[in-house]
Amino acid sequence: NRYVRKIEKRENPDLIIIGIPGGLMPFNKTLTNNFGIIAFLISQAVTPDFSIVSVLYDDIDVKYFNMLNNSFRYKYGFEVDCFNMAVTMFDAVTSIETQSLHFNFLDHAAVDDIINAKYSKEDIPVFNILNPEHKSAIIALIIEKLSAYAVREQLKTGGRI
């Protein structure tokens, strides 16, 4: 928290982007992703104004995204603004055999296809950041939400819009 505050005071940036490495939760009892400890620690120090959660490619049930959002709300203290579906797919068979994480990489068009087919009308949007249209949509969402914060802050301090 002090580190981010120091950057904020020293550089006065318009935006601070914090990427959290590693997994947010275990895959299973063997492949633990360090239990999402790094994500938990960072979430206790810094509350995001906008959050993008990346998920691995899979044919995920729509309800799963809502469950993830609830999990983040209670575990990390913030809600998910949008999901990014990565072009990376978890290779469970090889990972279990080798007791280490293995992934397969896909063409981003395959990810676009599943997003368009299953997730295009969800309350919490699902994007593929490698798709230029999706990238523009994410940027628009960020600007919209952060602009609303700026307006509220001006009203709170008695400033004009």
Where are these regions (language model features)?
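Conserved nucleotide-sensing/catalytic segment adjacent to the nucleotide-binding pocket
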Residues: 1-22
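A structural motif corresponding to the C-terminal end of an alpha-helix
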Residues: 11-12, 118-124
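Generic detector of well-ordered alpha-helical segments enriched in charged/polar residues
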Residues: 5, 69, 139-143
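NTP-binding/hydrolysis catalytic cores, primarily Walker-type P-loop NTPases
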Residues: 125-161
